[in-house]
Each structure stands twice: as structure tokens, then as C-alpha cells.
């Protein structure tokens, strides 16, 4: 790596590691705006994914953490873990490891009531798999606020009939109310990413609000539908025609996957699951 690139990627003596997808947030105005969107309250159960050098961690701790109710954080980079422990002490409980394998449910309060808030500047190279991993814990989550690549956020909030509407749109919109909150330019980071970023808010639907469906079946159906985006559903969903009376259901196969609302995918998945029972 050249000296100039090292300097650009160095912040507080730490060189950003590409394999961890590290881009450190450095713009204090942007940091303050993000914290205002999150609105942390004293004593809340909150976990930050990828705290990095603590740019967002510090104001979160100031607003909510106590030694009895610390901010939790999941961090993979062991060099950063030591720095964070030294800086924040017992106000931050660190969990060393990969967020893609972490059991976020272990941080929730006992019982059925949602109690956990999740925040983070997510590594862009694993953002989609991580969002899917988090759906397994939606039942115990109050809300999620993430910094993501703007293109990903646009897909998360996309409406049917638009090019941005995708498998990610369907699977996340089934489980969450999703709103884009804030645009973040590349120059807010060190090193600056090559893409624009945005803050997104995700609020899980309560279980009684969700139409009952086998999410594995829904995922398989949606994956098949979007497997060849330019083809009609009569081709991509051909394997389902024996188990689903699409015509009787009023489901038009002369459409592309991006034209079908979430509720229609859910209804077909319910029928597919029932046929396998």
C-alpha cells in the first residue's frame, strides 16, 4: 500500500482493513445527526454492530449507558477491541466475533416483549447477509438503525414496479416497516468509500401483525421469482404450477418478479406450504 493511501486510511493510529470493510465515520455533524435519529434513552438495551474506533459508540454511551446497563457491541477486529475496552471500560460490554454468527437474542430481556435496539455502521461487504441474519431475532427487537450503502437502502424501501424492487425488498418488507432517514456523503468517512451511504430505520412488525407464513418457503419462492429478473413469472415459477392454482388465485404470471407486491408473494407461499403439509 502506498504512503498516501495509508495516510488516507489511517484514523487515530489505526489503518482501516479492507477485509473487514472498515470505513470510519469521522464527520461530527453527521454523527450528531445519526444519534438524533436513534434517540437513545438511559438504561435501554442496545447493541452496536462494528463499533470501529468508537465514533458512534461514544455519544451512544453518553446518552444511555451505565455500569449496570452498558452498551453492548459486536466487533470482529481484535486490535480495535483492546482500544475500545481501554477507552470505555465498564460502560461498554464487548462481544468479540463475527456479527453474522452472533446470537443477538442472547442480549434481549427475558420474556416475549421486544426489548433490544440494534445500531451500526455495517460493513458494506456483508450488509445483505447480515440483514437476513438479523431477521431471526426480529421478535425481540424494538428497532434497528443502520448505516448502509445507499443502493442497498433504496432496494430495502423500493416499491413494486420499480427496478430497485428485489428479493431483499420482499423479504425485509414482510418483516419490518422500513424508512430511509438520512443521506451520508463519502467525505464523512476515512477512508471515503466509493459509494454514497444512508441511514435506514427498521421497525419489526409484531408477530400478531404478520400474516402467518413459513419464511423458508417464502424465501425459496422469492429467490426463484427473482432468479432471472427479465423473464416472466410463468418461467421462473414454473416449478410451482403443480401446487398452486395461479389462475384461480388471480395471480398473473404474465408479470416480472419486480411487479408483484409483498402480500401476493406471501399468499402464494402460504398455499405452497399448505400443499406440503
Curated annotation (Swiss-Prot):
It holds the Pfam family RrnaAD. This is Ribosomal RNA small subunit methyltransferase A. S-adenosyl-L-methionine binds at residues 23, 25, 50, 75, 98, 121. Specifically dimethylates two adjacent adenosines (A1518 and A1519) in the loop of a conserved hairpin near the 3'-end of 16S rRNA in the 30S particle. May play a critical role in biogenesis of 30S subunits. The keyword Transferase applies. The gene is rsmA. The keyword Methyltransferase applies. Its EC number is 2.1.1.182. It is found in: Cytoplasm. Belongs to the class I-like SAM-binding methyltransferase superfamily. rRNA adenine N(6)-methyltransferase family. RsmA subfamily. SUPFAM superfamilies: S-adenosyl-L-methionine-dependent methyltransferases (SSF53335). It comes from Paraburkholderia xenovorans (strain LB400).
Amino acid at each position: 500500500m502506498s504512503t498516501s493511501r495509508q495516510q488516507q486510511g489511517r484514523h487515530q493510529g489505526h489503518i482501516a482493513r479492507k477485509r473487514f470493510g472498515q470505513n470510519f465515520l469521522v464527520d461530527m455533524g453527521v454523527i450528531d445527526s445519526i444519534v438524533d435519529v436513534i434517540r437513545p434513552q438511559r438504561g435501554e438495551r442496545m447493541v452496536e454492530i462494528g463499533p470501529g474506533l468508537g465514533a458512534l459508540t461514544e455519544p451512544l454511551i453518553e446518552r444511555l449507558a451505565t455500569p449496570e446497563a452498558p452498551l453492548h457491541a459486536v466487533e470482529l477486529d481484535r486490535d480495535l477491541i483492546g482500544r475500545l475496552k481501554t477507552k470505555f471500560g465498564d460502560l461498554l460490554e464487548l462481544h468479540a466475533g463475527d456479527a453474522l454468527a452472533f446470537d443477538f437474542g442472547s442480549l434481549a430481556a427475558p420474556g416475549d416483549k421486544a426489548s433490544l435496539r440494534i445500531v451500526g455502521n455495517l460493513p458494506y461487504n456483508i450488509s445483505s447477509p447480515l440483514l437476513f441474519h438479523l431477521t431471526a431475532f426480529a421478535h425481540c427487537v424494538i428497532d434497528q438503525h443502520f448505516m448502509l450503502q445507499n443502493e442497498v437502502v433504496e432496494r430495502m424501501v423500493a416499491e413494486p414496479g420499480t427496478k430497485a424492487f428485489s428479493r431483499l425488498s420482499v423479504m425485509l418488507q414482510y418483516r419490518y416497516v422500513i424508512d430511509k432517514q438520512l443521506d451520508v456523503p463519502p467525505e464523512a468517512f476515512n477512508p471515503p468509500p466509493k459509494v454514497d451511504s444512508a441511514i435506514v430505520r427498521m421497525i419489526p412488525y409484531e408477530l400478531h401483525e404478520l400474516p402467518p407464513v413459513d419464511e423458508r418457503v417464502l424465501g425459496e419462492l422469492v429467490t426463484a421469482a427473482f432468479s432471472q429478473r427479465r423473464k416472466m413469472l410463468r418461467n421462473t415459477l414454473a416449478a410451482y404450477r403443480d401446487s398452486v392454482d395461479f389462475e384461480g388465485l388471480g395471480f398473473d404470471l404474465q408479470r416480472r418478479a419486480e411487479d408483484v407486491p409483498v402480500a401476493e408473494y406471501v399468499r402464494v407461499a402460504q398455499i405452497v406450504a399448505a400443499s406440503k403439509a
